[in-house]
């Protein structure tokens, strides 16, 4: 089901393990397991490299109100819980992920409601093998760690959505 959504100009990032820009910004060692999920917000503006923002920025510039952010925070942390369990069950660590939300009109309740308006995939998540910490996501491309398709296929195989043998070429 696809609906046109009014997208919030915010990327919502959940971090379970320190890596990437978090380690660069704060000097935290790569791979540090965070005591609880860290929720970050970035302003969606490619020409500004999607800068990190606070809730105060969001409210001051009217990108969302407090009620909307509270709803989105709860949804995002719930999605994190679900994904942590899903990936843990197939031997993958969910390091972090980013998602976006929007508002759509719900005729049943006659008001706009907040919906997840983004994909959840190895393009939007950092996924590491539990035993080897091998990267199974877009970092394979970013860090020149090998064929990105192989990582994506490995995730798909573990999820049971791709057969062991495939004709997808590298």
Task: For the regions a language model picked out, list residue spans one by one.
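A long amphipathic alpha-helix within ATP-dependent nucleotide-binding catalytic cores
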Residues: 63-95
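C-terminal helix-cap and adjacent tail motif
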Residues: 120-170
């Amino acid at each position: 089901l696809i609906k046109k959504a009014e997208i919030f100009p915010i990327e919502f990032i959940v971090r379970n393990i320190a890596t990437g820009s978090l380690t660069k910004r704060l000097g935290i060692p790569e791979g540090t397991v965070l005591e609880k999920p860290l929720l970050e917000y970035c302003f969606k503006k490619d020409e500004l490299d999607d800068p990190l923002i606070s809730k105060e920025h969001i409210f001051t510039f009217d990108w969302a109100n407090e009620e909307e952010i509270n709803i989105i925070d709860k949804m995002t942390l719930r999605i994190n819980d679900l994904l942590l369990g899903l990936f843990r069950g197939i031997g993958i660590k969910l390091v972090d992920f980013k998602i976006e939300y929007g508002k759509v009109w719900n005729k049943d309740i006659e008001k706009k409601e907040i919906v997840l308006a983004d994909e959840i995939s190895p393009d939007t998540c950092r996924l590491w093998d539990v035993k080897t910490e091998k990267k199974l996501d877009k970092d394979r491309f970013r860090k020149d760690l090998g064929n990105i398709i192989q990582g994506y296929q490995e995730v798909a195989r573990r999820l049971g959505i791709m057969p062991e043998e495939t004709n997808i070429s590298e």
